């Protein structure tokens, strides 16, 4: 069973969101997603300054198995990307909820958070998929 940290919010497309304070949220893919994709070989991240709407595809995770779009879980402006992934994309596999974060976004619409799942809801969605 995949690790689903309680302090995070989730999407049904397997992204997670962590509030960093001041309207800034870190975004990554879940342990379940990285298990499905396998070993990461490249992460195509959005440009800092890009404005995204919730649901927009804004990054791509390329693994030995497939390339998968990553969707913005909330609307806002990309304020930082994880440059470590350029040389070490495997961080998404080894630490998806820590060093393997993808980008940080300044939220523009707090109501987007209402659309996200809590850990229990995300775990239930995984069990439905099995």
UniProtKB/Swiss-Prot annotation:
Q: Give start and end of each Lipoyl-binding domain.
A: 24-106
> Which is one Gene Ontology cellular component term of this protein?
cytosol
Any GO BP annotation:
glycine decarboxylation via glycine cleavage system
Kindly state which keywords UniProt assigns to this record, in alphabetical order: Lipoyl
Cofactor requirement: (R)-lipoate
Q: Which residues carry this modification: N6-lipoyllysine?
A: 65
Which InterPro entries does the protein's record reference?
2-oxoA_DH_lipoyl-BS, Biotin_lipoyl, GCV_H, GCV_H/Fam206, GCV_H_sub, Single_hybrid_motif
Q: How is the cofactor bound?
A: Binds 1 lipoyl cofactor covalently.
| Presence of keyword Transit peptide | no
Signal sequence, renumbered to the chain: none
A UniProt-annotated Pfam family: GCV_H
Function text: The glycine cleavage system catalyzes the degradation of glycine. The H protein shuttles the methylamine group of glycine from the P protein to the T protein.
- Give the matching PANTHER family: GLYCINE CLEAVAGE SYSTEM H PROTEIN (PTHR11715), GLYCINE CLEAVAGE SYSTEM H PROTEIN-RELATED (PTHR11715:SF3)
Report the family membership.
Belongs to the GcvH family.
Q: What subunit structure does UniProt give? A: The glycine cleavage system is composed of four proteins: P, T, L and H.
Q: Which HAMAP family match?
A: GcvH (MF_00272)
* Record-given protein name: Glycine cleavage system H protein
Species source reads Pectobacterium carotovorum subsp. carotovorum (strain PC1)
């Amino acid at each position: 069973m995949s690790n689903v940290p309680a302090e995070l919010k989730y999407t049904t497309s397997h992204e997670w969101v962590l509030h960093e304070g001041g309207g800034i949220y870190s975004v990554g893919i879940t342990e379940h997603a990285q298990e499905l994709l396998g070993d990461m070989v490249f992460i195509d991240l959005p440009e800092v300054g890009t404005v995204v709407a919730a649901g927009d595809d804004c990054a791509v995770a390329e693994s030995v198995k497939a390339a998968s779009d990553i969707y913005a879980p909330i609307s806002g402006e990309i304020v930082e990307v994880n440059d470590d992934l350029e040389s070490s994309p495997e961080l998404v596999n080894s630490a998806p909820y820590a060093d393997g974060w993808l980008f940080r976004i300044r939220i523009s619409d707090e109501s987007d958070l209402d659309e996200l799942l809590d850990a229990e809801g995300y775990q239930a969605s995984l069990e439905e998929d099995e």
